Amino acid sequence: MGRSRHHNKLKEGIFEAEITALSHDGRGIAKVDGKTTFIPFTLPGEVVKFEYTFTKAKFDEAKVVEYVKKSSNRVNPPCDHFQICRGCSLQHMSTDAQIEHKQQTLINQLKYIGNGVEPENILPPLRTSNTEGYRNKARLGVRYVSKKGKILVGFRERNGRFLADIDKCIVLNPLVGDKITEISSFIETLSIYQHIAQLEIAIDDTRPAMIVRHLEPFTNEDLEKLRSFAQENNYWIYLQSKGPDTIFRLYPQGDVEPKKLSYQPAAGIDIGFEPNDFTQVNNDINKKMIKRAIELLDISENDSIIDLFCGLGNFTLPISQHAKTVIGVEGEPTMVKRAKETADNNNITNVNFYAANLFESFEDKEWFNNFEYNKMLLDPPRAGAQEVCNNIEKFNVKRIVYVSCDTAALARDAGILVNTKGYKLISAGVMDMFPHTMHVESIAVFEKI
């Protein structure tokens, strides 16, 4: 005999609650009869009237009917698409309040995930003067929607199922963000407009590059249209038919100068990169972040420093201007190759780069056994640097500067360093790499006791 399924019935009517916190994706959280209710576009301290839109055993979802009490931190969102587009989550919150919330998130996670870790000092937040047009990297979805009779280009809707119908994006660099409609209209002129899946955007100090991910071959006429569009808009256009190894530059063709996109992380250093390489999203904050990391490392001319998860040498190369020697280690061999090329091109001779998986044992590696370091910079991906922290005593470094794109991973690793490895957390703070979003970029300094 089949088992009947139990369906939770949606409560009907208008209800009232106070918002007490924000979720990881920026929705307001209210407790109603002890049950968590997520209510979008609300802020802590606000009282709202709402109606339920979805219910499950452990939580409910709802939408605002009326704001009974508004937060003093509430502002009018600067983007017309904020209600539908998932690209931003905090445009209704003042930038000061966004920073304060991110700083508190960092402190809370250090304490609870890090098992009681607290920084001796809170660093002043690194802020950008421009909270719009800051984003130089993005992946934009492309979809032909027959009901609308047009191509959509942009981020997903808040429900995550479809692309948001937008005509511009205020957080993207305006060289692309102001041209969403123009790009959409151009794609409609291509013969395979229904088979273009994604545009990967990367913008250097002077020009945008765009990788067009296509599922069917372009015709010769399409290719000519793409070249013309690139020339008219000063874009570099790349095509990608399958995996990353199929990416090639369509325009400009031939042996042109410069051969790659490039940016300056610090005065006197140019880093070349391909549009699918990892680079920081926000150039302004990146430069400030590098400057702060160098200050926090407290570098002397006799220091030997190891930079783990070094990427293209974003920190390694600027650090080399102040230290005796610097070793950069990165898991992706192509990034290591480019970092070496950059060092050569910039006539930097006191650095070396190695490829190694830093999520597994590294005790047999040349860079681990043949060099001695007294300071370390960590800039891991979201997964953090657990393997490194578990073996930190083998490096014998006195000071660690940890740059994090995930506060939970930082808190976990801080717990290892402070509670089991004899380090103290000198200072920590946030960097507003992604204004108007819940993403928290942070930096912390550990010192051997």
UniProtKB/Swiss-Prot annotation:
Q: Where is the active site?
A: C405
Q: Fetch the InterPro entries from UniProt.
A: 23S_rRNA_MeTrfase_RlmD (IPR001566), MeTrfase_TrmA_CS (IPR030391), NA-bd_OB-fold (IPR012340), SAM-dependent_MTases_sf (IPR029063), TRAM_dom (IPR002792), U5_MeTrfase_fam (IPR010280)
Q: EC? A: 2.1.1.190
Detail which positions bind [4Fe-4S] cluster.
C79, C85, C88, C169
**Is Lipid metabolism tagged as a keyword?**
no
State the signal peptide span.
none
Q: Does the keyword S-adenosyl-L-methionine apply?
A: yes
Which reaction(s) are listed as its catalytic activity?
uridine(1939) in 23S rRNA + S-adenosyl-L-methionine = 5-methyluridine(1939) in 23S rRNA + S-adenosyl-L-homocysteine + H(+)
The residues that hold S-adenosyl-L-methionine are Q280, F309, N314, E330, N357, D379
Sequence ranges assigned to domain TRAM in this UniProt record: 1-66
**One MF annotation (Gene Ontology) recorded for this entry:** iron ion binding
Which GO terms are recorded in the biological process aspect for this UniProt protein?
Answer: rRNA base methylation
UniProt entry keywords in alphabetical sequence? 4Fe-4S, Iron, Iron-sulfur, Metal-binding, Methyltransferase, rRNA processing, S-adenosyl-L-methionine, Transferase
UniProt lists the family membership as follows: Belongs to the class I-like SAM-binding methyltransferase superfamily. RNA M5U methyltransferase family. RlmD subfamily.
Q: What does this protein do?
A: Catalyzes the formation of 5-methyl-uridine at position 1939 (m5U1939) in 23S rRNA.
What's the name of the protein? 23S rRNA (uracil(1939)-C(5))-methyltransferase RlmD
